Swiss-Prot record:
It comes from Coxiella burnetii (strain RSA 493 / Nine Mile phase I). One of its GO terms (cellular component) is cytoplasm. It is found in: Cytoplasm. An FAD assembly protein, which accelerates covalent attachment of the cofactor into other proteins. Plays an essential role in the assembly of succinate dehydrogenase (SDH, respiratory complex II), an enzyme complex that is a component of both the tricarboxylic acid cycle and the electron transport chain, and which couples the oxidation of succinate to fumarate with the reduction of ubiquinone (coenzyme Q) to ubiquinol. Required for flavinylation (covalent attachment of FAD) of the flavoprotein subunit SdhA of SDH and other flavinylated proteins as well. SUPFAM superfamilies: YgfY-like. It comes from the Bacteria. Belongs to the SdhE FAD assembly factor family. One of its GO terms (biological process) is succinate metabolic process. Its main location: cytoplasm. This is FAD assembly factor SdhE. Transmembrane segments: none annotated. PANTHER family: FAD ASSEMBLY FACTOR SDHE (PTHR39585:SF1).
């Protein structure tokens, strides 16, 4: 898949069923996605495959993801929103 198409699909995946997640994820995408490494972009894409309630808990710090890669991206999203 080419980069612009993949990027558009990831942007679309930032749209969730919860307004709070939409705000956090879309802002992160708009402000930080381009500066991520290729690996971080892949991890962010995998993060977006997770269910909304779990993402919500991770982003608000109620639960910590087991994956160290997810933890790094979650921290970046949290830093942007603080």
């Amino acid at each position: 898949m080419n980069e612009p198409l993949a990027s558009k699909k990831i942007r679309w995946k930032c749209r969730r069923g919860m307004l709070e997640l939409d705000i956090l994820l879309e802002r992160f995408y708009e402000e930080k996605f381009r500066s991520l490494t290729k690996n971080e972009k892949e991890i962010f894409n995998q993060l977006l495959d997770q269910p909304d309630p779990l993402l919500y808990d991770w982003l608000l710090g109620h639960v910590t993801p087991e994956s160290s890669e997810f933890k790094k991206i979650i921290r970046k999203i949290q830093q942007l929103s603080s």
